[in-house]
A protein has these predicted regions:
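Hydrophobic positions on the alpha1 helix immediately C-terminal to the Walker A/P-loop
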Residues: 62
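Conserved lysine of the Walker
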Residues: 59
Length: 323
C-alpha cells in the first residue's frame, strides 16, 4: 500500500499478508505506517492481554474486530462479557446466542456448582455472599464465626449429593434453603444467635421480597453448562440491563466467569475470554481475587483472557498478581 487513500479504497479486501507473516491483523502502527499481525497461539500456554484506554477511543470496536478475525480466520471460539449491549453486533454477525442478563428475567443461583472440590465450592459461594452483604466474613471474631457457620450450612447441603460434579442447576440448593439450614446451626448458646442473625440478614436480601431475591433465589435459567458437548461455540453475554445495580452486575459477571472457568478445566482447546469494563469487578475485592485466580487457570488450559479497562491503575493491579 503506497498511500492512505489507496488503503481506504482497498480496505474491504483487507491487508495483503506475506506468506511468512504469522498471525492475524491486530491493528496499525502509530501513524498508520504499517499493519501489525500477531499470533497468540504459538506457545502451549495462552497469553493474556490487558487493553487500556479512555472512553471513546475504540476499545470495544477493536475487541469486536479481534474476536471476529480470530473466529473467522482461525476458528478460535470466544466468550464475550460486556456491559453496554454492544455484543449484539458480533452475535448478529455470526448468528450466535446473545445472553442478556436481566434483574427481572434472569436467575443465577449462587449455589450452582462451579468447582470440583467441596472446599473450593464453599469458598466460592461464601465470596458471593460477602459481596451481597457488602462486608467481609473474616477478620474479627464474630465475622470468623459467621464464615464458619455459613460454610457449615453449605457443606451440609452439598454433602447430600453423592457426586458434587453431577449437581445440575435444577438440583442445586437455593438461597432460601441455605437460610433455613443456617438458622438452625450453632452448637453453643453464643453461636446460635449469630447463625440466626446471619440467616435473617441473607434472607432479607436474597429471599422473599428482598432486593436481590428475583435474581438470586431460584434455579438458574441461563444455559451455562457444557451439556456433554465436545466443543462450545462462541457466546456473547451482555449485562447492560443490570447497569442500575452494580452489585447484581458484578455477581452476574462472576457466575458467568465461574461457569467458563469450570468448563475450561475439561480440555485444552484454544478459546478467548473477553471481559469488557473489567473495573466493574474491581469494585469488589473478593471478586477481583476470583478473576485473578481464574486467569491463572485459563492460561494453563490455552484460554486467553482479554481484559478491557479505562484505568491504568486497575490494570496494574491485575498484572501485579499475574506476573
Amino acid at each position: 500500500v503506497t498511500s492512505r487513500e489507496l488503503a481506504v479504497m482497498l480496505s474491504p479486501l483487507g491487508y495483503r499478508k506475506l506468506s511468512a507473516t504469522d498471525g492475524i491483523l491486530r491493528g496499525e502502527a502509530v501513524g498508520a505506517s504499517y499493519p501489525v499481525f500477531h499470533n497468540s497461539w504459538r506457545d502451549k500456554r495462552a497469553t493474556h492481554e490487558i487493553w487500556v484506554g479512555v472512553s471513546g477511543f475504540g476499545k470495544t470496536f477493536g475487541l469486536n474486530c479481534y474476536l471476529t478475525r480470530e473466529y473467522a480466520e482461525n476458528g478460535i471460539p470466544f466468550d464475550m462479557l460486556e456491559p453496554m449491549g454492544h455484543g449484539k453486533h458480533i452475535a448478529d454477525a455470526f448468528g450466535l446466542p446473545w445472553y442478556v442478563m436481566s434483574a427481572k428475567a434472569t436467575k443465577l443461583n449462587p449455589q450452582d456448582v462451579m468447582f470440583p472440590t467441596l472446599i473450593e465450592q464453599v469458598s466460592h459461594v461464601t465470596r458471593i455472599y460477602e459481596t451481597v452483604l457488602g462486608r467481609s466474613l473474616s477478620g474479627a471474631q464474630r465475622e470468623n464465626l459467621e464464615r464458619g457457620l455459613l460454610g457449615e450450612a453449605l457443606e451440609i447441603l452439598y454433602r447430600g449429593f453423592p457426586d458434587l460434579n453431577k449437581v445440575s442447576p435444577e438440583l442445586a440448593p437455593t438461597c432460601d434453603v441455605v437460610c433455613d439450614v443456617l438458622s438452625g446451626l450453632g452448637d453453643k448458646e453464643a453461636t446460635k444467635p449469630i447463625a440466626k442473625n446471619l440467616a435473617d440478614e441473607i434472607a432479607g436480601l436474597c429471599t422473599g421480597s428482598g432486593p436481590w431475591a428475583e435474581f438470586l433465589n431460584g434455579a438458574t435459567n441461563v444455559d451455562l453448562s457444557r451439556g456433554g458437548r465436545e466443543r462450545i461455540e462462541p457466546r456473547v453475554f451482555s449485562f447492560h440491563e443490570l447497569e442500575s445495580d452494580p452489585i447484581l452486575q458484578a455477581l452476574a459477571y462472576t457466575q458467568v466467569l465461574s461457569a467458563i472457568r469450570r468448563d475450561s478445566l475439561i480440555d485444552e482447546q484454544p478459546r478467548i475470554i473477553a471481559v469488557d469494563e473489567v473495573y466493574r469487578l474491581m469494585r469488589h475485592p473478593s471478586l477481583l481475587d476470583f478473576l485473578i485466580e481464574a486467569a491463572k487457570t485459563f492460561r494453563t488450559r490455552r484460554k486467553k483472557l482479554v481484559c478491557v479497562d479505562q484505568s491504568r491503575a486497575n490494570s496494574r493491579r491485575v498484572v501485579a498478581h499475574l506476573c
